[in-house]
Amino acid sequence: MSSTLPALLCVGLCLSQRISAQQQTLPKPFIWAEPHFMVPKEKQVTICCQGNYGAVEYQLHFEGSLFAVDRPKPPERINKVQFYIPDMNSRMAGQYSCIYRVGELWSEPSNLLDLVVTEMYDTPTLSVHPGPEVISGEKVTFYCRLDTATSMFLLLKEGRSSHVQRGYGKVQAEFPLGPVTTAHRGTYRCFGSYNNHAWSFPSEPVKLLVTGDIENTSLAPEDPTFPADTWGTYLLTTETGLQKDHALWDHTAQNLLRMGLAFLVLVALVWFLVEDWLSRKRTRERASRASTWEGRRRLNTQTL
C-alpha cells in the first residue's frame, strides 16, 4: 500500500492540474452582424463581438487569419466591441470569428459568422407552380431563373429564421416543396450565386398562400421541412438569444463536469489516505501485540 500511495497521489495531482488548466479557458464570445448577415454591396455592416466584462483585448478573425484588434477602455465596464466594414464587397464576404482576452487568459473562439454580400449580379425571377394559392397537401415547385450564367441558386423564406434551400443549374433551378401545410405560408425570395458568400440582387417576393387547415394545426411544423441534403439553416444574426443560451448551457455543463471529476479525485485521494493510515495502524497494532507476546514468552521461559 505504501508504494501505491505515491503513484496515486501523482495521478491525482496530474488530474487536478489538468482540470485546473481546463477551467482557465474563458467561455467563447457571441458574434453577430448588424443590421443583418446579408449585406448589399457598398453598404456598411457592423460585426459585434460580446465577451466578459474585464476583457482587455478582442480579436476578429477572417477566414482563419487575424483581421482586426480592439482594446476597450475601460475594460471593466465594457463587454462588447464593434468592428465596422464601411464598404461591403466580395473580398470582405466570408466566415468571421472572434476571441477575447482577460489578463493572460484567452477565450475559446466564437461560432462562425457567415457574412454574405448581395447585389453582385443581376436580379433573378422567382415563380411558383401551380400557383401562389394552393390547398394544404398539394405539392408546389419554385423556379428561380437568372439569365446571367451562374452555378448556384438559393431560396429563402422570410420570417424569424431564414432557411436557405440550395439548387443548381446554369440559368434556372427548381425547388420542390410539399406536401405543403399552413406552416409553409409566407413570402419567398431567391438569389443567384457563384459561391456561398457572394449573391445576386434578391428576386421580387412571391407570397405563398395555403388554404385548408390540417386537423390539428398545433402539430404542424413551425417552419417548412425540406430534404436534409439540400437545406442549411441560417439563424438571423440579430437574433442571438438562442445561440447565447446554448453557449451558456454548454459552458455550465462543462464546469459541472469538471467540478464533479475534481470532487471524485479528491474523494479517491482521501479514501486512499484513510486506507493507508488504517493499514499502518493495523501494522503497528500487530507489531505491538507480537512484541508483547514475545516479552511474555521470554518471561515464562525465564521463570521455568
Swiss-Prot record:
Disulfide bond positions: C49-C98, C144-C190
One GO BP: regulation of natural killer cell mediated cytotoxicity
Annotated glycosylation sites: N216
Keywords assigned: Cell membrane, Disulfide bond, Glycoprotein, Immunoglobulin domain, Membrane, Receptor, Repeat, Signal, Transmembrane, Transmembrane helix
Stretches in topological domain Extracellular: 22-258
Domain Ig-like positions: 34-118, 129-211
Tissues of expression: Selectively expressed by both resting and activated NK cells.
Cytoplasmic side: 280-304
PANTHER family found in the cross-reference section: MHC CLASS I NK CELL RECEPTOR (PTHR11738), NATURAL CYTOTOXICITY TRIGGERING RECEPTOR 1 (PTHR11738:SF14)
Function: Cytotoxicity-activating receptor that may contribute to the increased efficiency of activated natural killer (NK) cells to mediate tumor cell lysis.
Subunit structure, as described in the record: Interacts with CD247 and FCER1G.
Name the record gives this protein: Natural cytotoxicity triggering receptor 1
Encoding gene, per UniProt annotation: NCR1
